[in-house]
């Protein structure tokens, strides 16, 4: 996929809900798995348009594949990209607040 053809729904794959990310939501930080081809500007536009919020900043990191083994079969997990989105003061994503 080319970057120009990515829609907002293609950029944000799913929210990451762990104990750590749930605690970060109190600090207005939301964590998403995003498309590997996306960048900070695309993630910011996608979050702002899909959830009707204002984004203060976006931090992105590539998560490296981990070696896994099941019996005699060896492999690796897939590589993926994680985005930590910090919202401006007074904004929350209500759709994600109920998840636990």
Swiss-Prot record:
The keyword Ribosomal protein is annotated on this UniProt entry: yes
GO MF term list: rRNA binding; structural constituent of ribosome
Source organism: Pseudothermotoga lettingae (strain ATCC BAA-301 / DSM 14385 / NBRC 107922 / TMO) (Thermotoga lettingae)
GO BP term, pick one: translation
Assembly and interaction partners: Part of the 50S ribosomal subunit. Contacts protein L29, and trigger factor when it is bound to the ribosome.
Protein name: Large ribosomal subunit protein uL23
Coiled coil: none
Keywords: Ribonucleoprotein, Ribosomal protein, RNA-binding, rRNA-binding
Protein function: One of the early assembly proteins it binds 23S rRNA. One of the proteins that surrounds the polypeptide exit tunnel on the outside of the ribosome. Forms the main docking site for trigger factor binding to the ribosome.
Annotated SUPFAM superfamilies: Ribosomal proteins S24e, L23 and L15e
GO cellular component, as recorded: ribonucleoprotein complex; ribosome
InterPro entries, A to Z: Nucleotide-bd_a/b_plait_sf (IPR012677), Ribosomal_uL23-like (IPR013025), Ribosomal_uL23/eL15/eS24_sf (IPR012678), Ribosomal_uL23_CS (IPR001014)
PANTHER family referenced in this protein's UniProt entry, alphabetically: 60S RIBOSOMAL PROTEIN L23A
One Pfam family recorded for the sequence: Ribosomal_L23
Family: Belongs to the universal ribosomal protein uL23 family.
